[in-house]
Amino acid sequence: APEDAARYMLLCREQQFTLEELRASAAGVPLSDGDECTGNAEGEPVLCRAGRSSFWLTWDGRMIPCGMMASPGTPVLEQGFSAAWRSVRTEVEAIRLPAACAGCALRRHCNLCAASCFAETGDYDRKPDYICSLTHTLCRITREKYGTED
């Protein structure tokens, strides 16, 4: 359930971040945990390294942008490495994340990515309700625990 996952994520963050950083997060400042998959452009592109500066090779010889994505995939042995890399990069450039998420006040706190969208909805541009609920819950419990009374 999103509530349990959010509580676990907060426990992990408590090991990784200082009290001041957690309090700032409760006040709306995104934590910098090295996650490059955040942004705020409408229908934003893939912002992580998937298919932009990294790839995975599958057991059957396909090049895919990320270990969490089954497609797009290009057969390396049939097309050659350079052509497969160009194909994966071109296909990843065409992927757009949900426009509905771009205007969300919590977008900079969200772990939305193309793989999570596709895994939950079957599309890259449809909002994954689980990730959305998880983000809202994590922000709420962080505010409850680390927010300051004004």
Describe the residue ranges of each PLM region.
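C-terminal accessory region of radical SAM enzymes
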Residues: 1-43, 62-112
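Short, small/polar residue-rich loop motifs at catalytic or cofactor-binding pockets
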Residues: 48-52
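Short, acidic, Ser/Thr-enriched surface-loop or helix-capping motifs
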Residues: 57-58
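Sparse recognition of residues in long alpha-helices and their boundaries
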Residues: 76-77, 113, 120, 148
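Cysteine-cluster motifs in flexible loop/terminal segments that predominantly coordinate metals
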Residues: 95-142
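Iron-sulfur (Fe-S) cluster-binding modules
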Residues: 142-150
